[in-house]
Design a protein with these regions (language model features):
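Pepsin/retropepsin-fold aspartyl endopeptidases
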Residues: 1-168
């Protein structure tokens, strides 16, 4: 089932931050990986042509890829079926290589904020200066807790604008 659609960016790798593309957040009731069931698996799908395996799967078991014999194996850490559903925010906050906190993916199209907009405040915590990229990718940089947050961003007119986002 589709939980949301949006434009934006959220991935970063050796090639830098991905370009903004159409994203779809989808969830399936059950996903079976090498005979092991996972419940409520949600992921972000994109039309990017490169294959990706979420490293989050490693929290639930070990993966073996045998290229010589062309096989894939998954050895779960437990026999129970884990529920993997994790709510996501209406706006995914992202630090870009230029050092600014920005809206990565915007799932709720009704919000005034758009992908790429610079965020200057999260729950009263100001982000007037650039962030260190290493720190931003290894530590929690934004005070997000609970199921609701207030963020301020710079709108297209160059003015600060407030928006309330929710975790769903």
């Amino acid at each position: 089932r589709t939980l949301g659609e949006g434009m934006g960016f959220s991935s970063m790798g050796v090639g830098g931050v991905e370009a903004a593309t159409r994203k779809v957040r989808v969830c399936t009731d059950t996903l079976t990986v090498a005979g092991y069931k996972l419940a409520n698996v949600c992921c972000i799908a994109t039309d990017n042509p490169t294959s990706r395996i979420g490293t989050g799967l490693l929290a639930y078991g070990d993966i073996t890829i045998d290229y010589i014999h062309n096989t894939f194996a998954f050895s779960p850490h437990t026999d129970t079926t884990p529920n993997l559903y994790q709510p996501d925010w209406d706006v995914v906050l992202t630090v870009t290589p230029d050092g600014w906190l920005r809206a990565g993916i915007v799932w709720d199209k009704r919000l005034a904020i758009h992908s790429g907009d610079r965020i200057v405040e999260v729950n009263g915590h100001r982000f007037d200066n650039k962030l260190d990229m290493r720190e931003a990718t290894t530590k929690a940089f934004a005070p997000l807790s609970g199921n609701k947050a207030v963020i301020k961003f710079i709108n297209k007119k160059g003015k600060e604008q407030k928006v309330v986002i929710k975790r769903r």
